[in-house]
């Protein structure tokens, strides 16, 4: 069954949150697609993932890469699973994919300070529950650590 995790960003950027979540995914041996809603955003995330920290390397490519099937992380703007990912991150209000049931995990990261993003996340929550997916909601505590909320 597909597990859907909703990550509620407040007073933090996607750029600060995404790299550690991707690192944890790779540590677990998962392959990942990160879907945003524009080519410009995907390219900005691509540049950020190469430079976000001096002492790390996060192997990835965009959907345009000729060897996308060999990459552990693909940044995309459309549906599809070019690298046979187990996990799909949905950022910037990217919609649930038609093949959502084909992933072990979907991670919907949304900006809680953006009314449209909040409304879209609520709609996605309802949709995921209706599809029978296991859904969890995550928010940071006062120390900035992710905590599951019920």
Q: Where do the PLM segments sit?
A:
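Long, hydrophobic N-terminal alpha-helical segment
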Residues: 1-47
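ASCE RecA-like P-loop NTPase motor cores
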Residues: 2-4, 25-31, 94-101, 123-131
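Structural motif
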Residues: 9-10, 33-39, 74-76, 89-94, 107, 111-112
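An N-terminal amphipathic alpha-helical segment
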Residues: 16, 83-98
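Glycine-rich, aromatic-bearing surface loops/beta-hairpins
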Residues: 105-150
